[in-house]
From Swiss-Prot:
Name the UniProt record assigns to this protein: Transcription factor SWI6
Molecular function terms from GO: DNA binding; DNA-binding transcription activator activity, RNA polymerase II-specific; transcription coactivator activity
Stored PROSITE patterns: ANK_REP_REGION, ANK_REPEAT, HTH_APSES
UniProt superkingdom: Eukaryota
Pfam families: Ank_4 (PF13637), KilA-N (PF04383)
DNA-binding region in chain numbering: 143-164
Any one biological process term the GO annotation gives: sporulation resulting in formation of a cellular spore
UniProt-annotated stretches for the region Disordered: 1-107, 272-293, 323-358, 653-684
Lineage: Eukaryota, Fungi, Dikarya, Ascomycota, Pezizomycotina
Species annotation: Pyricularia oryzae (strain 70-15 / ATCC MYA-4617 / FGSC 8958) (Rice blast fungus)
Coiled-coil features, chain-numbered ranges: 698-759
Every HTH APSES-type domain range: 112-219
Amino acid sequence: MASTVAGNSFVSQQHPGNLHSANLQSQSQGFRRQNSTSSVPSTASFDPPNGSIANTGSQKHHPMSSQQSQPPASQQSFSMSQTGSQPQPSQSSFRSYSDQNVPQQPQEASPIYTAVYSNVEVYEFEVNGVAVMKRIGDSKLNATQILKVAGVEKGKRTKILEKEIQTGEHEKVQGGYGKYQGTWIKYERALEVCRQYGVEELLRPLLEYNRNPDGSVSQANLNTPTKEQAMAAQRKKMYNSGADSRNNNGGGTFFKNISQTAHSAMTAISKARFDSPGPRGRNGPTRAPSFQRQLSTQSIDDFHGGNSQASNFAENFPPQDVNMAFSAGSEPQPGGLNGTEPPRKRQRMDMTPANSFGAYANNSQMQAYADAFPGSPTEPNDSFIYTQHAAANDTLLQQQHDQQTPLQPLPYEQSVEAENKRSMLMSIFMNDGMSEQARVDTLRQIHPRDLDMPIDSQCHTALHWAATLSRMTILRRLIEAGASPFRVNTSGETPLMRACIVTNSHDNDSMPAILDILGNTMEVRDSKERTVLHHIALTSAVSGRSAASRYYLQCLLGWVVRQGAANGGQLNSQTFNGGATVSQSQNATRLDLGRFMSEMLNAQDSAGDTALNIAARIGNRSIISQLLEVCASPHIANRSGLRPTDFGIGVDSDGAMKTKGDSGGDVENGDVGGSSQKSNESSNEIVTSITHLLTETSANFQEEIKNKQKNIDSLHATLRLTTTDVNDLRRKLDEAQARVKAQQLARQKVTNLQRAEERERYRLTQLEQTTGRRDIASANGWEAESNTLLATINATTNGEPDADAKLPSSALLRARIEAVKKQTESTRQSVVALKGRSREVEGRYRHLVALATKCRDEDVDSTMEGLLKAVESEKGELEIGRVRRFLGGVEGVIG
């Protein structure tokens, strides 16, 4: 049966068989991921109508180029060194024990175990801290991992892959689980690469594993342990190897100088363990193996057992019974457990010995053993035996798993019916005067499924509002009416997370009550893989909320302690009798301090940050001290490689790592487990990386400055050429404008002459109409005739002969005289008319000159001489157009 771990595609396999736990190395190293930089993101808040809910932060986190879900702490791989390699310092959350109390032993070969990444089954083998994989289906190996084992740096490794590996047949995996990514090549090509880079001997166990002498691939070995089995056996070996040197005083745990909360937790769990019925003789059997997921569900008491229960079981029962018990795991099981599809990682389930051995409970010895020692969830468990009862309860466990899965928000409907239901839910919070019975009646009118409907734009439910505003009565009524505490908002936040973001629960001192109601959602993660601990650490960075965050964390740890003690007392008095009820299954899956410390305390979000890492960056000492007291690991790095130790958490003033000593004080651990050396190496790596980054940045800056200077010089040259062109164009423009002005002046003169000609023609026409058209030749002849006549008269007067006969007739003379008179009169009238017109124009011009010179009209004649000299002194011709425009503007004033 498969169980997908939230947030990643990793699915482990469990095969029955011998774990060879005696050959496992006793050091444990947490899985270190290569993560990108993380920042404290903004936690959006909502504003209920009857409460004050502030925003918890506004800093925006930069997006990652490729977000990958990380496995929880229960699925982190462990690192074991090959014989002869340098021992690696422990990075687990139990570092204070493993570094100080475990005696140094010769390193042994790392085991080969099975795992599933991105739905592909692989054999996994760790060498020098590098997990090397070989596919079970086609025996292909990851060339990237082989080069890592060979110690090839990342830059050279990339060039080798591009030039040597990827030129041939290969398969490049970029998506999916991070450890599975890389370049996969065939077995033969992988063998050549191993020989080329001198790692064939190191990888020989994996290369030759599950292969026949003739080189063919045999069927999958069912005795190969899974990663969880190998890690559980390794941790058991680690404890057993240091059990004799461990000090058992104080609280009876290997956690030294822990807080009162953690000490109470350990006392409660130990009491529940030792109060369970049945004798606890040293030489008698401890308890029958039960089906339990070792890594993620193992309690703290796994580190308190004595000898291996597998060996005790072999001593107390005949070999044939042992063989029968182990062979039962390979038989077809109900519920899909058959030989072709081995059972995968399942939900945790505690059973009595009778249920653990299933069909073999009829054996009298086994039955007596089961009756004498019923199962206890607080005792260590090393068995990986699958029983028919376990398969029969798969459906029940799947239902319980579904209850622990966050429910996505319902769609925000806009219908009238939905608005009415939303208004009914809102009225519960807005109407403070509503009675308790009225609230109950209102909730009864709404279907349980509609209680989870979103009531605001961020898809918060009524349960979110009640938890945020710390309305305990409404919160209880909603749960009783059927509202799901697993329904999340658009950010994947549960009501419990929302309650930890604001200070209302701190002000009302209601967090313990909220945890009693919503505590079963503590393991749920939001869309960024953050737990309640992450939200508490993030909220502590907001001004004025540090005290509330400290209070929430204290209440949370206290609640976990109480849950562990309550579960221990209840389950010790319960037996499954062939099947478990829903309530019993829920009790069995409650979160106790053991699971809290192994699964939640060091859980990493999508950016790789643990709650301690966030608190270390923020610098909240109260949160840091509480997390360190319950053994949060300061050595887990995020995607950017930053650890709490980089911020001085878990490091003394000299830079040496600190651990908890028996005396209750911090002691140096620089010589134990290579912690100080590891810290110094990490610091040197950071300094080297920063130096390289600064050098590279400076070189890039200088190169960019040179390029910019070249561009500036080119622009200056272009600017000079452009300026010259502009000056030439301006000169040409001035010349063109001068020519245009001359043309305009010439056109104006022509226009004036044409107008004057038209006026003269008009006057001539009028004159001809008045006096008649005159012939110039006849007029000249008349003058000549007059002159001749006068000469004749003068001659006659002087005694010349009579010339009367030559004179014109009197009638002609009279006509001529009359014509002369008329002409004279017409000329006189024209003169008078001209004088009148000249007088009018003269008055206008006099008034114009008076306005221009700012004097009276009578004084114009006295200043005329000076004005004439001023006008005559002007050089060049006057612009007639400007004079006409000026006179035209003045005519309106004069008129």
